[in-house]
Amino acid sequence: MRDLKTYLSAAPVLSTIWFGALAGLLIEINRFFPDALTFPFFSF
């Protein structure tokens, strides 16, 4: 039961950090490449 409480308390924290970092990354990409359909660093 203690492990379940640890999981339930850690998963929301980790997912919040992950989604916050992902949102920040997307915001920064859109700041440098606004309205881009293709990104220069993805083209080969």
UniProtKB/Swiss-Prot annotation:
The chain crosses the membrane at residues 7-27. The keyword Cytoplasm does not apply. One of its GO terms (biological process) is photosynthesis. Keywords: Chloroplast, Membrane, Photosynthesis, Photosystem I, Plastid, Thylakoid, Transmembrane, Transmembrane helix. The keyword Transmembrane applies. GO terms for cellular component: chloroplast thylakoid membrane; photosystem I. It is found in: Plastid, Chloroplast thylakoid membrane. It comes from the Eukaryota. InterPro entries: PSI_PsaJ, PSI_PsaJ_sf. It is a single-pass membrane protein. May help in the organization of the PsaE and PsaF subunits. Belongs to the PsaJ family. This is Photosystem I reaction center subunit IX. The gene is psaJ.
